[in-house]
């Protein structure tokens, strides 16, 4: 197995107006997401708000685990990614998994409490096997409701690893292959157009596992690379009464060539838009675009279809 250090000899040459290809996750990413989930739950008038509130609690627990534990970097791989998501279950997984289950005690309803009790009863070998099935996308029907906590624990570990890297550590992807995270290889859940002073107007894809971001040209479809058939679609308030505020920033970036779409969020419309959290608060957009014949690109680890 080829590995390399976290600080290679070859550095990216950065000019005065350098636009970083890759952005490491913020150290308070889970705390910020917890606040966003709480806001979205308050804005939601349906029964879905309870699930958004649960995810806020889980994100708070993620931040606590992120702050509490140390996650030494594993050997970094050469090639298209440096921290491949399909690798073995990380050493810190069981500790974080237990932390998250314990942190939700007393903050959830009876159904969730019953589910976490089942997960707490798993042996270390059973929990590790469950995580391995989820990492390798070989889940079984009984695994579905457990995925929330497993995915949340895996996010903490991979995010902690990614936060220790710099742009120099991460391979630059070709323009034709920018739907997959160059850090861990996970497909982007969506993208965000930033309003950060030095990066205003730039589109960055967002990884749902390691929470890093990487630049992709706005003029091209991130899935097939075509630049001729891109459309931005949106659910407008005039067509849907009492539309949740999150929809103001959410767009479906659809492609007439490959008939896929991926969600994009404009921070100039909602400065706290989070591609993981806001995705779950704007599912009406997915329904509308799906009914128009487009296939979604990018999975959200917290969107459990069919459960």
What are these regions (language model features)?
Residues 13-169:
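N-terminal alpha-helical interaction blocks
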Residues 121, 146-154, 190-195, 303, ...:
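Short N-terminal helix-initiation segments at or just after the protein's N-terminus
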Residues 162-289:
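Cys/His-clustered metal-coordination modules, chiefly Zn-binding fingers
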Residues 277-307:
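Hydrophobic, glycine-enriched assembly/anchoring segments
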């Amino acid at each position: 197995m080829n590995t390399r250090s976290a600080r290679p000899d070859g550095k990216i040459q950065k000019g005065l107006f350098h636009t970083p290809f890759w952005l490491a996750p913020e150290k308070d990413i889970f705390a910020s997401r917890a606040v966003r989930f709480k806001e979205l739950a308050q804005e939601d008038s349906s029964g879905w708000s309870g699930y958004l509130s649960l995810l806020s609690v889980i994100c708070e627990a993620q931040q606590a685990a992120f702050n509490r534990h140390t996650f030494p970097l594993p050997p970094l791989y050469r090639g298209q990614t440096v921290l491949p998501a399909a690798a073995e279950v990380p050493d810190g997984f069981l500790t974080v998994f237990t932390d998250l289950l314990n942190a939700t005690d007393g903050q959830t309803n009876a159904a969730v409490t019953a589910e976490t009790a089942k997960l707490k009863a798993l042996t270390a070998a059973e929990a590790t096997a469950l995580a391995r099935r989820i990492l390798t996308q070989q889940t079984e029907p009984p695994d579905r409701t457990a995925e929330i906590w497993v995915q949340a624990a895996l996010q903490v570990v991979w995010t902690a690893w990614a936060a220790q890297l710099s742009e120099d550590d991460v391979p630059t992807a070709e323009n034709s292959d920018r739907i997959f995270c160059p850090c861990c290889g996970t497909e982007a859940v969506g993208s965000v157009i930033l309003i950060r002073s030095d990066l205003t107007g730039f589109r960055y894809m967002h990884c749902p596992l390691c929470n890093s971001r990487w630049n992709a040209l706005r003029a091209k479809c991130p899935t097939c690379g075509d630049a001729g058939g891109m459309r931005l679609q949106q659910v407008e308030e005039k067509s849907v009464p009492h539309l949740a505020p999150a929809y103001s920033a959410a767009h479906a970036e659809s492609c007439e060539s490959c008939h896929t779409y991926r969600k994009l969020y404009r921070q100039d419309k909602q400065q706290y838009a989070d591609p993981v959290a806001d995705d779950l608060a704007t599912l009406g957009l997915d329904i509308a675009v799906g009914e128009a014949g487009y296939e979604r690109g990018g999975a959200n680890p917290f969107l459990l279809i069919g459960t």
